[in-house]
């Protein structure tokens, strides 16, 4: 199903995010593990409420694992990740008692005994509590059963202030939920509530990341798996604002108290020349006392210049 938006009286085709690609690939790989056969296509409903159906590519499998890829389609948006393959490798983790342990941990955390009963409640309230606990388990189990990590071409977080903690794969929260929900639905349908490991990789992401803002944000070694709606809207102002907000969060986590932003190429060029000259003067005059502030100012200038004059970071605009 193709979706379009209008920008400046132009009809532009929407695409789908790397997060949607990852979830669809994971869905396809897990389906193979459960059924032993590949589908030609996979489909899911994005958080925006728009269904996406894609072809599966690079389908391979081995003893206890399966892997496939989905090709990113950014629609009419300019995006360095357009056309790259997003892979998902699925493996069942062998732990016979895992589900029982997860179930018991949820019962205990809810104040229930081993039989699922909570002391001191009437039979009717016990029944209601059991229903509530079952709903709680259903909500929590996808996170418990589906482990997600990044492989080659997926960046690693090295700075605070981003969506994921330092050391984690740069797979944002919404894509993680999309992956877990897609996988858990298949497990539940098959009656196979087993621990699954999902590894997302983008071999072309190593080179693509060099054209993105990720290195400045503290995301090293690859691209990010992104998307809050699952859909790429071409020339999205909201995505531009979110890109700037992400960098500001990183600067805030580093203790920066101010940044400088400018409109357009002329403003960026003026800021670059003025801050470098003024910063050098201040540093010389005060024997380096303003060096940290000068570095901060120059970095702020680079941020403004990079984002506002050369185009917004494409892989962050999903």
Segments predicted by a language model, with ranges:
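Intrinsically disordered, low-complexity terminal tails and inter-domain linkers enriched
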Residues: 93-144, 278-310
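Ubiquitous "structural anchor" signal
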Residues: 27, 33, 57, 119-124, ...
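Generic N-terminal targeting/processing segments that precede catalytic cores or assembly contacts
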Residues: 1-106, 127-217
């Amino acid at each position: 199903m193709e979706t379009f938006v209008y920008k400046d009286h132009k009809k532009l085709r929407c695409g789908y995010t790397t997060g949607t690609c990852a979830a669809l690939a994971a869905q396809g790989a897990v389906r193979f593990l459960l059924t032993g056969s590949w589908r030609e296509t996979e489909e899911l409903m994005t958080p925006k409420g728009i269904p996406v159906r894609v072809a599966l590519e690079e389908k391979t499998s081995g003893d206890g694992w399966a892997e496939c890829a989905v090709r990113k389609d950014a629609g009419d948006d300019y995006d360095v990740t357009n056309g790259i393959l997003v892979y998902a490798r699925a493996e069942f983790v062998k732990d016979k008692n895992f589900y029982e342990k997860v179930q018991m941990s949820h019962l205990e955390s809810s104040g229930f005994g081993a039989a699922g009963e909570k002391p001191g409640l009437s039979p009717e309230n016990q029944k209601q509590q059991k229903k509530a606990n079952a709903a709680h388990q259903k909500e929590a189990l996808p996170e418990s059963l589906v482990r997600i990590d990044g492989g080659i071409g997926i960046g690693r977080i090295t700075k605070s202030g981003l969506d994921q903690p330092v050391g984690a794969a740069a797979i944002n929260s919404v894509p993680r939920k999309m992956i877990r929900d897609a996988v858990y639905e298949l497990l539940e349908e098959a009656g196979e509530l087993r621990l699954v490991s999902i590894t997302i990789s983008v071999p072309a992401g190593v080179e693509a990341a060099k054209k993105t803002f990720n290195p400045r944000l503290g995301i090293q070694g690859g691209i990010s798996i992104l998307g809050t709606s699952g859909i790429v809207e071409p020339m999205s102002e909201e995505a531009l604002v979110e890109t700037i907000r992400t960098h500001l969060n990183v600067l805030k986590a580093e203790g920066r108290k101010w940044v400088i932003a400018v409109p357009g190429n002329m403003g960026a060029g003026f800021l670059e020349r003025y801050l470098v000259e003024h910063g050098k003067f201040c540093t010389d005059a005060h024997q380096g006392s303003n060096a940290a502030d000068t570095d901060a100012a120059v970095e702020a200038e680079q941020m403004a210049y990079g984002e506002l004059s050369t185009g917004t970071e494409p892989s962050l605009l999903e």
